Amino acid sequence: MKVTVLGAAGGIGQTLSLLLKLRLPAGADLALYDISPVTPGIAVDISHIPTSVNAIGYAGEDPSVALKDPSVALKDTNLVIITAGIARKPGMTRADLFNINAGIVKDLVEKVAEVCPMACIGIVTNPVNTLVPIAAEVLRKAGVYDKSKLFGVTTLDVVRAKTFVSELKHKNVETVTVPVVGGHSGTTILPLLSQALAEGRLLDFSQTEIESLTQRIKNAGTEVVEAKAGGGSATLSMAESGARFALAVFKALLGEDCVRYAYVQSKEGSGYPEFFAHPVRFGLKGIEEILPIAPLNEYEQTQFEELKPILEADIELGKKFVNP
């Protein structure tokens, strides 16, 4: 079994690669690819860590690899994690990333369609709302689209909600669960605090707490960008969240039961936008089942109605990028 990280030399990619080297099951293969010439060195660096995961790196500028061609890294892979692209800077929204990152992800997914069409694809690169539909259209054009094998990684939203709720309510963070659905941008993330649990029991929030927590979860990415004063975005927490997700899906492909939130194609006629973050059961072939979202309260329903047209516009933007 093999995982390939595309964008492995970036701020998220390096840390993600390290975490996968530490956490993947013994005997797993880990391929790292980036256009940066340092990528093989990153693989050498983490290969010195004593785990039974085999890491090898490929660079787009490596003479043994066709220029900017990740084909060798993708050969026989089971799971592709895409982190390639530019990161957010102060004043930038995820939408500002679109013009650059859309082209990068489109090119990479075209290679996935060609080299490993049966692989599962997890997209970390922002804007996830738009890049996942781009990937879907690219795979459709290639005749290999399988909605059970494509997902946007929204784990960071769930991780942040869990952390912020545990801090506010002084609960053991390991016992806290908070559903987070919707999209993966400040205007489309929807935490369902009415369903938040600690130690298996529903938590009580005042309306002020709900509104404050909701806004903090939605804008947590901006909080990090501003706190780093121009020195980067949420690379470390994103890498850790991406590693959690990748590891869970990898184990599901090996037969372990796994439920995670992910931005995936919704069931037709469900009333949700075409792509939406749902609770998902993963299995041997990728997505096995999209699980139902419990009824929303009035505040959450209002939020849902507000985000729906924004998310639908994001999705349409992605589709038109591939099919003008």
UniProtKB/Swiss-Prot annotation:
State a single Pfam family of this protein. Ldh_1_N
**Protein residues bound to substrate:** R88, R94, N126, R160
Enzyme class per UniProt: oxidoreductase
- Intrachain disulfide bonds: none
One Gene Ontology cellular component annotation? cytoplasm
Record: residues binding NAD(+) = G7, A8, A9, G10, G11, I12, G13, D34, N101, V124, T125, N126, M238
Keyword Protease tagged:
no
Its recorded reaction(s) are:
(S)-malate + NAD(+) = oxaloacetate + NADH + H(+)
InterPro entries membership: L-lactate/malate_DH, Lactate/malate_DH_C, Lactate/malate_DH_N, Lactate_DH/Glyco_Ohase_4_C, Malate_DH_AS, Malate_DH_type1, Malate_DH_type1_bac, NAD(P)-bd_dom_sf
GO biological processes: malate metabolic process; tricarboxylic acid cycle
Which residues are catalytic? H184
Query: Which keywords does UniProt give here?
Result: NAD, Oxidoreductase, Tricarboxylic acid cycle
Q: Which GO terms describe its molecular function?
A: L-malate dehydrogenase (NAD+) activity
What are its E.C. numbers?
A: 1.1.1.37
HAMAP family linked to this entry: Malate_dehydrog_1
Role summary: Catalyzes the reversible oxidation of malate to oxaloacetate.
User: By its UniProt entry, which PANTHER family does this protein fall under?
Assistant: MALATE AND LACTATE DEHYDROGENASE, MALATE DEHYDROGENASE, MITOCHONDRIAL
Q: Which family does the UniProt entry place this protein in? A: Belongs to the LDH/MDH superfamily. MDH type 1 family.
Note the subunit structure: Homodimer.
This protein is called Malate dehydrogenase
Species source reads Haemophilus ducreyi (strain 35000HP / ATCC 700724)
